[in-house]
């Protein structure tokens, strides 16, 4: 960024400022739970993106997403392996069951670009 200030006598001064973008993490959390008619017992979550060596991807899911304090279950390894998750939580305090997913990506020591492109899946 270059700033030039000039006065009425045509004298000027210039300042140059350099900004460096340093994004080291990104987090996503659904704001609204996906509605469920009955207690969800299993889910499959897939995440597309670029996850080079040195970065850390963390993923959590809950089946009581309408609760004031949902019971988050770590599904990071199952997402990385493309495996189904069976919920351990069997309780809710809200009127209805609902599924939420949240993910966090940390740059860590990665030297390549890392990003989350999409999050998808299903539950039953």
Regions found by a protein language model. Give the residues of each.
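Beta-strand-rich ligand- or partner-binding modules
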Residues: 1-124
């Amino acid at each position: 960024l270059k700033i030039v200030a000039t006065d009425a006598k045509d004298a000027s001064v210039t300042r140059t400022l350099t900004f460096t973008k340093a994004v080291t993490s990104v987090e996503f959390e659904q704001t609204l739970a996906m509605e469920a008619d009955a207690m969800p017992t299993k889910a499959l979550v897939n995440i597309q993106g670029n996850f080079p060596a040195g970065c850390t991807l963390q993923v959590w899911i809950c089946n009581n997403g309408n609760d004031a304090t949902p019971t988050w279950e770590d599904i990071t390894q199952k997402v990385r392996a493309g495996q189904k998750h069976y919920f351990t939580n069997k309780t809710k305090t809200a009127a209805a069951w609902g599924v939420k997913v949240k993910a966090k990506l940390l740059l860590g020591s990665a030297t390549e670009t890392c990003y989350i492109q999409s999050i998808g899946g299903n539950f039953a």
